[in-house]
Amino acid sequence: MTKKKRENLGVALEIDGLEKKLSQCRRDLEVVNSRLCGVELSSEARRSLEKEKSSLMNKASNYEKELKLLRQENRKNMLLSVAIFLLLTVIYAYWAL
């Protein structure tokens, strides 16, 4: 996803979207695997399904890598939010005394 698009979406929404894409990709992969294991196929049909399977596996791998990065970014954002909250709490407590 481009940096411009990322700025418009929240990290949590991006994670949700990628999880949906990954889930769909895994379902498609299961369908391809069941077709490969099922009926006798011609060598051309088998090659086509193997190619599709490879493509889906690469896509799933890329989605997983991007999800990992987004989760790390989300974790950093959460820690930053907690740090700001604690800082404001300390400032308020000092001011209130």
From Swiss-Prot:
It comes from the Eukaryota. InterPro entries: CCDC-167. It is a single-pass membrane protein. Residues 10-79 form a coiled coil. It is found in: Membrane. Keywords: Coiled coil, Membrane, Transmembrane, Transmembrane helix. The chain crosses the membrane at residues 77-97. The keyword Coiled coil applies. Pfam families: CCDC-167. GO terms for cellular component: membrane. Signal peptide: none annotated. This is Coiled-coil domain-containing protein 167. It comes from Bos taurus (Bovine).
